[in-house]
């Protein structure tokens, strides 16, 4: 996991892209992996940024292996050759 912050029982990261379109394209690609893992983040889009927050609600809002696995997968998703 690259540049994820662990605070308040959550893993957090902001992904930064060159444009709004790249940010949205990344979210679309990420949604495929999110559905595959059936582990859904809280996330927001702010122009060229996507803020992602991971925690496992059914384990008492704590960080679990599910969160770490999704974080690692999200780190590998590229848009136009960039992360």
Language-model-detected regions and their locations in the chain:
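Solvent-exposed alpha-helix faces
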Residues: 28-29, 72
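Short aromatic-glycine-(Arg/Gly/Cys) micro-motifs in beta-strand/loop hairpins
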Residues: 1-10
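A common structural junction motif
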Residues: 31-39, 78
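C-terminal structural segments of small proteins and small subunits
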Residues: 55-83
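Short beta-strand
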Residues: 4, 42-45
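Disulfide-stabilized extracellular beta-strand modules
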Residues: 47-57
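Short amphipathic alpha-helices within nucleic acid-binding modules
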Residues: 19-28
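Short, well-ordered beta-strand elements within core beta-sheets of diverse protein domains
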Residues: 10-18
